[in-house]
Curated annotation (Swiss-Prot):
L-serine binds at residues 230-232, 284, 384. Its EC number is 6.1.1.11. It is an enzyme of class 6 (ligase). It is found in: Cytoplasm. It comes from the Bacteria. GO terms for cellular component: cytoplasm. The keyword RNA-binding does not apply. It catalyses: tRNA(Ser) + L-serine + ATP = L-seryl-tRNA(Ser) + AMP + diphosphate + H(+); tRNA(Sec) + L-serine + ATP = L-seryl-tRNA(Sec) + AMP + diphosphate + H(+). ATP binds at residues 261-263, 348-351. This is Serine--tRNA ligase. PROSITE patterns: AA_TRNA_LIGASE_II.
Amino acid sequence: MLDLKRIRTDFDTVAAKLATRGVDAATLNQMKTIDKERRDLLVKVEELKAERNTVSAEIAQAKRNKENADDKIAAMQKLSAEVKNLDATLAELDAKLTEFTTTLPNIPHESVPVGADEDENVEVRRWGTPRQFDFEAKAHWDLGEDLDILDWERGAKVTGARFLFYKGLGARLERAIYNFMLDEHGKEGYTEVITPYMVNHDSMFGTGQYPKFKEDTFELSDTNFVLIPTAEVPLTNYYRDEILDGKELPIYFTAMSPSFRSEAGSAGRDTRGLIRLHQFHKVEMVKFAKPEESYEELEKMTANAENILQKLNLPYRVVALCTGDMGFSAAKTYDLEVWIPAQNTYREISSCSNTEDFQARRAQIRYRDEADGKVKLLHTLNGSGLAVGRTVAAILENYQNEDGSVTIPEVLRPYMGGLEVIAPK
């Protein structure tokens, strides 16, 4: 959530930056008008309350003097009615203002490239060289079926489209991958957490999914619970409504969890394979940092995600998202895109973002600065480290052999009992 004071005092700059994120000037001008009306009304209400207090004191004095106070009582009743009506109007204006402030996206950092959509993202660097096959490479969904380790047909039967069963060595490979990821992040100072897989509506508001992106989630009807779309939600809300000791920052968390997404608006996209599912595992990284350290922490977090891909020897590139392609809460985002041979392209496997104080303001996560003792909003960061299903897809395709088998990356073999190859039965 944006700082209303910043919008008010630096309106033109904020408007220009939000315009690069698709927020039209009319919306902000309407918000500005409502804010001014509210502030003017607050002044009037305070004046009326002061006048009411004066009349109340005069009534008390008249009664002590045994004087007639009917006129003053009538005047006070009129003032009270006016205050009540204005308070109701204020409540309406507050609700409108809240609707604006909670649905506006974050202000992009000055280093973010300006652009309308993903076509204007900027490649930062590449690592590794895509493999050249001397045979026709298969897509991961075909490899998974041929090796009898992924079963979409029964996933669709039991649940529906975009669900599957991992079985045998497929299930073991998935488990090996996320255990490896958690171990690597642990070496970098992240505290491993097992989170709830359901959160309440306040938590969804805190990280920015609610109210704007409610349709993308799975709510449990007649409850206050929502299936988590990412472990970012419970991990970030861990400190909601708390004041942390500045000496403890930065704090690093990591968690593996299922993620549940309705994929509203994704009809017809990635209908086969592991790229876009309603339920998938993801290892998440979350950081709580001081404002002056958060961009250094973003670079470190991105490097932590890259470390996983490098140790798996999977070619990838790092892309700086432009203003028009960033997520709602992000001030700056790097996407890591892994090479998928069957599609002859790079696909997102991680997204690392600094939300600055956007989520912290919504969730009221603050810290006490040890230097001056003041309580301040901290910065929150989040990143995938990595999406596990997409990592399975990348390994199956990049490590496939001509005989239909798949070589297991060396770093994963200790997690799979020393197994080196998944071969057709």
